[in-house]
């Protein structure tokens, strides 16, 4: 059940296309079926980093069974993808990783 949550201080023209591409890419990177991937994109113009409102992204990737020993590789792949799609330089793109225990992810009336 991967969740990719993206907060950006610059808007994206075709959000639906971007969200769909992001879903496919996260499934590919994590080797999971896209059926359970969730992607949330939020435009928030009230977002600065290092006293600058230049384009920036804050990203959360949460997943059951996230291979924490591979977060460096996963980070590189996600940053390459997001930077190419949004134009945000990688030094202004941040990812927070969370490996969610199955008993802490509710779904379909229970937990995973």
List each language-model region with its residue ranges.
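Interaction-mediating elements
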Residues: 1-112
